[in-house]
């Protein structure tokens, strides 16, 4: 996740505020809060975030406690976002479905995460799509040195 740092303009700098709802009011399919999942249930990391509850955190403060993974300033922002978008566009739209499912249903496994996180995305969606198994699909050209041709309109 990216958050813009504006060190020269604190009044305009975006902030993020964590509240009690972030600690379990809306559990994931794993039964964990999203913060617990993000920090792998590690108490020191969760305690550091809880200590900041109710405080507006700028990009540097949010990065320091692990709430964001990147905090580029306004000089680097456009390039960082462009690179992230180019990397994402280079992937098959169907593979992104699988990556999203892996992120949404990660962590402690149970029957719900197995069905909706793995089986549904991979068996019923990704491996049946032309982007994977078509003539120029990723699975057909894998290892041959050819570049897959993706149908971007199927997303």
Language-model segments: which ranges?
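Crotonase-fold acyl-CoA enzyme core
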Residues: 1-89
């Amino acid at each position: 996740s990216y958050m813009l740092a504006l060190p020269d303009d604190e009044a305009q700098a975006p902030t993020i505020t964590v509240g009690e709802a972030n600690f379990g009011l809306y559990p994931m399919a794993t039964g964990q809060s999203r913060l617990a999942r993000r920090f792998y249930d590690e108490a020191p990391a969760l305690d550091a975030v809880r200590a900041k509850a109710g405080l507006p955190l700028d990009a540097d403060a949010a990065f320091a406690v692990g709430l964001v993974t990147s905090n580029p300033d306004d000089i680097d922002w456009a390039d960082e976002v462009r690179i992230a978008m180019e990397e994402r566009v280079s992937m098959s739209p169907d593979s992104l479905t699988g990556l999203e499912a892996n992120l949404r249903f990660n962590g402690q496994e149970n029957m719900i995460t197995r069905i909706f996180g793995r089986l549904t995305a991979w068996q019923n969606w990704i491996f049946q799509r032309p982007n994977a198994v078509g003539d120029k699909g990723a699975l057909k050209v894998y290892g041959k040195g050819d570049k897959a041709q993706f149908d971007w309109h199927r997303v």
